[in-house]
Amino acid sequence: MMRVIGLMSGTSVDGIDAVLVELWGGDRDLQVTVLNFCTVPYPDALRQRILEVCGAKSLTLAELAALDEAIAEAFAHAAQRVQRGYPRADLIGSHGQTVFHRPPVGDRLGYSLQLGRGDWIAWRTGMTTIANFRAQDIALGGQGAPLVPRVDWCLLGHATEVRCVQNIGGIGNVTYLPAQLEDPEGKGVMGWDTGPGNMLLDLAVTELSGSELTYDPDGTWARQGKISEPLVEHWLQDPFFHQPPPKSTGREYFGLPFWQRCRTDATGLAPADLLATLTEFTARSIVESYRQFLPQWPQRIFLCGGGAHNSFLRERLQVHLGDLPVETTAAAGIAVDAKEAIAFAILAYWHELGLPGNLPQVTGARQAVPLGQRWLGQR
């Protein structure tokens, strides 16, 4: 048994999800017990700095170093907070904060930058830390994303049921899980980024509310609006949605520039109508991605990430998915908000065991390898 802390902050830049888990077994026989979970919000000033950098604001190398360390300090604090009152963890798996992601193009390797240096976290906490999970996959020609499908296969795969796991963070990504009796090695597991998750909605709400809100709780504001179907169809013509997997994306593509385009296209729409239309666009982008690229229609879909709390978005997904059961991962015993942090605890654990964390058919990497770099803590 190993006690591991998982740390995650996604493209929504809401804060740091921290989980403390006990792990047994390897991959297919993996067992997880969650001991504690918390979300530690970023201080407002730090969140704003991160969003500015993600929005392509220039900064000096000294400013970059300072931001890297400030994020690492926040992650270290989250690790210390989640294990308070529990025996000392053996290991930390820290995803860090993505501030730039560029998929590979042609012969050029991809590039993905996560701030929140692992050496700082190891020094601050005294615990061995695994971080920089995406680099090894990228070095082997992969996208460096998504990295969660192997974890999904182990935790949420089913003997006879074909399933999809849809994460709705800032960006949406899906894992396709074939029935394990028919595919015991998981060779048919697929995964890719479906497009925007909460990102466009959050940008819209922030601007439309004059920064009084940073998101639309439960989709309440959007629910009051009327959907513009022509705009949804227009936005769905973007080339990303027709690009076959493996594929990944980020704030560079579906962040501020895309939002500005949507806002211009929606000139004259009332705020609630624009939010309703963006919600429909997000739901349709997910469902159309399934229709284009899934080898088989699933029998059940599990939602996770912040978007799983948006009941209006869930309703729009259900409208387009018909009678297909759509649940959250909580129905399978995995808390919606903790799932991604659990995944990076597991990837760190697999690193220690020498087990691969990526799936080449998902990321496009040449082979499966253990993920992350290791910084030794003080015993």
From Swiss-Prot:
Keyword terms of this UniProt record: ATP-binding, Carbohydrate metabolism, Kinase, Nucleotide-binding, Transferase
Keyword DNA-binding assigned: no
GO MF term list: ATP binding; kinase activity; phosphotransferase activity, alcohol group as acceptor
Biological processes, Gene Ontology terms: 1,6-anhydro-N-acetyl-beta-muramic acid catabolic process; amino sugar metabolic process; peptidoglycan turnover
Ranges in coiled-coil conformation: none
EC number in record: 2.7.1.170
Keyword Signal in annotation: no
Protein family: Belongs to the anhydro-N-acetylmuramic acid kinase family.
Primary role: Catalyzes the specific phosphorylation of 1,6-anhydro-N-acetylmuramic acid (anhMurNAc) with the simultaneous cleavage of the 1,6-anhydro ring, generating MurNAc-6-P. Is required for the utilization of anhMurNAc either imported from the medium or derived from its own cell wall murein, and thus plays a role in cell wall recycling.
Protein's name according to its UniProt entry: Anhydro-N-acetylmuramic acid kinase
Source organism (scientific name): Thermosynechococcus vestitus (strain NIES-2133 / IAM M-273 / BP-1)
Gene designation: anmK
